[in-house]
């Protein structure tokens, strides 16, 4: 697996990601980052890291412009587009598909989306899944079994994984602040996944998360 950082596409944030040991990142977009897609892309191209993926910001699913601009940025950077919004359910996938994304893309699983629903609403319809471990932990009592099954059965449709800690109520926690069996999760990913693993914790916690994963897999 390839460990990837996460940060906004500003020069200081990108430099800091490189200082934490990352050579690639997933971009956390804010509305202002899409005011000038060419300028945002140029900032990346001049930075010490590359963009592995671009995460749409949390726009309303019936507002196509933010999604299309995110797609345009991903295209310019030759990056993967993570289609996700707190306002969109997986039942909105047909609407989002109608925006005709040109970059390779996948849909991130929402909190509460079970393995069964992800198979029915996304994977068995041919869509890629960006598998968020925290959201899966919040959705599946047999979390490790579900994680393993999804990677085993649909690995060719899961190019990006988000790895973070979580409780059943709160996600995006620093490693060790939640209840996910992190080392066992890392073992499952190491055994069944060879794509990008985005350490989706706050920037100041990413170096520690990276160190822990490397130690577990040593």
Where would I find each of the regions flagged by the language model?
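A cross-family glycoside hydrolase active-site/sugar-binding cleft signature
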Residues: 2-8, 26-28, 52-57, 82-84, ...
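Short acidic/polar active-site loop segments enriched in Thr and Asp
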Residues: 23, 50, 79-80, 159, ...
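Short, charged/polar "capping" segments at the starts of alpha-helices
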Residues: 12-13, 33-38, 89-92, 115, ...
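N-terminal pre-domain/capping segments
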Residues: 1-57, 61
């Amino acid at each position: 697996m390839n460990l990837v950082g996460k940060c906004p596409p500003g020069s200081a944030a990108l430099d800091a990601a490189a200082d934490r040991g990352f050579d690639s990142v997933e971009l956390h977009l804010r509305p202002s980052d899409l005011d000038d897609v060419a300028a945002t892309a140029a900032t990346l191209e001049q930075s010490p890291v590359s963009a592995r993926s671009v995460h749409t910001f949390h726009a309303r699913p019936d507002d196509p412009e933010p999604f299309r601009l995110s797609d345009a940025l991903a295209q310019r950077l030759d990056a993967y587009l993570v289609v996700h919004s707190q306002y969109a359910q997986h039942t909105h996938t047909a609407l989002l598909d109608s925006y005709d994304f040109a970059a390779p893309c996948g849909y991130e699983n929402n909190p509460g989306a079970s393995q069964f629903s992800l198979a029915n609403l996304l994977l068995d319809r041919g869509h890629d899944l960006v598998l968020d471990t925290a959201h899966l932990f919040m959705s599946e009592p047999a979390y490790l079994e579900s994680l393993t099954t999804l990677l085993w059965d649909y690995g060719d449709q899961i190019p990006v994984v988000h790895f973070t800690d979580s409780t059943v109520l709160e996600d995006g926690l620093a490693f060790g602040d939640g209840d996910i069996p992190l080392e066992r999760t890392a073992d499952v990913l190491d055994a069944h996944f060879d794509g990008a693993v985005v350490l989706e914790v706050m920037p100041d916690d990413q170096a520690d998360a990276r160190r822990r994963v490397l130690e577990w897999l040593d």
